[in-house]
Structure formats: C-alpha cells, structure tokens
C-alpha cells in the first residue's frame, strides 16, 4: 500500500482496498466512491468510476443490497422510517429505491414504535409523559401518526 498521497496507487491496489471494504459490509456506490477518494485524493476520477462500474457489473457492489441491509439494521435499532430515509439519502441512495424498500416494511412501523415505547415505559402516562415520549418517538424517526398510534396503544 502506498502511504504517500502524491504517489498514484496501482489499479490492483485500489481494487484490493475496495474488496477489503466490501468484505466487511455492504456499501452504497457513493459511500465506496467517497472512501476511495478520501484514501487517494489525487486518483483520477475515471479510474474510480471504472472500478465502481466493474464492481457493480460483477454484482459485488449494489445499492439495492446496501439499502436492504441498512434498513434492516436500523429497524433492529428501532429507528423510524423518516430517520432511515434521511440516513440513506445522505449515503447517496436514490429516492425511488428508498421509497421501495421502506414501502416493503410499511406494516411494521407502528409495531416498532409501540415496541420501543413499551420497552421504555410501562403503565399509564400522564399528559407530560405522553408529550415526552411523543417527542422521543419523533426524534427516532417515526411520523406523527405512528407516534400517536403507539401512545394510544398503551
């Protein structure tokens, strides 16, 4: 591996770096592009784009797989669809792909919000307590309706 930022890495070096990253977890195309450019800022754009295109063609890099994996991970952390959508946009995933994946889990959001709320609090809530948990649900990325449904289920 070249440590000098002025020295151009070989194509094999860049590909090996990409393989190591992809071996650990799924990446979006934009995320992997940013990681490569951060490591080698002077690397030619055409070389990076060619590598990314090749990885997509070989089905080693896929925004679809990344989106599925990322949504599943954040759902396990009891995050809501609004927060997940914002995180995926920040990682360069298309809005159409985000909407498609979130729609696949449409029936689960209310259950996630209710499950999170039941873990946080047991028993009846007074007005101030409802407001506190409502705000916390919104901060976790749940919509107004999902938060209200979760609060009403207690």
Predicted features and spans:
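An alpha-helical, amphipathic repeat domain used for nucleic-acid recognition
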Residues: 1-154
């Amino acid at each position: 591996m070249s440590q000098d930022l002025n020295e151009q890495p070989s194509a094999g070096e860049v590909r090996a770096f990409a393989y190591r990253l992809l071996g650990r977890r799924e990446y979006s195309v934009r995320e992997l592009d940013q990681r490569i450019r951060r490591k080698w800022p002077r690397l030619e754009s055409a070389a990076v784009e060619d590598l990314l295109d090749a990885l997509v063609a070989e089905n080693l890099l896929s925004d679809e797989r990344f989106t599925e994996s990322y949504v599943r991970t954040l759902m396990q952390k009891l995050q809501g669809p609004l927060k997940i959508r914002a995180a995926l946009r920040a990682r360069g995933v298309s809005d159409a792909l985000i909407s498609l994946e979130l729609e696949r889990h449409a029936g689960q959001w209310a259950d996630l919000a209710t499950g999170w709320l039941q873990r946080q609090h047991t028993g009846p809530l007074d007005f101030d307590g409802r407001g506190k948990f409502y705000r916390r649900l919104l901060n976790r990325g749940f919509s107004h309706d999902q938060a209200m449904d979760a609060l009403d289920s207690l």
